[in-house]
C-alpha cells in the first residue's frame, strides 16, 4: 500500500516548539505553536500544513522539530497521539522527558527496502522521539543534560498501541 503518512491524525501536548536554523540546530528561544503550522494541540492531519510557506517547514522539508511538552519535570505524562484512518491503528505516547522530536521522513529517498520489498519514499514514516532538547549543553536556558559521576539517569517512555 501507499506508505505516505500525510493522512495520519496527530496531536501533541505542547504549546511551544524550538525553532531551528537551516542546519536543524535550535537557534534561540522557544516559540508558540499557536497560529502556525506547528500547532498540533488539537488533532490535525500530518500532511495538512506540511507544505505551507513557513520558514521552519521549508528548512527541513517538513517537520523535524522539538516540541516542549506541557508537563511537570520528570513526571510520566501524556505526550502525543497519532492514528491512521486507513488502518485504525492508534499510538499514544507518554514520557518523563521534557520534549518530543517530530520527524516526518523528509529526507527518505526510496532507496530503503522494507518488508515484502516495500520502498519507503519521502514522508513514508513518522517519528515521535522523546528526548531532552537538542544542543542542551550549549543552551543554559534548556533543561540540563549534565550527568555527574555517581548520578543515575533514568527516563521512561511508553508507546501504547490500540485499534479504533
Regions found by a protein language model. Name each.
Residues 1-164:
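An exposed, glycine/acidic-rich loop-and-rim segment of catalytic or binding clefts
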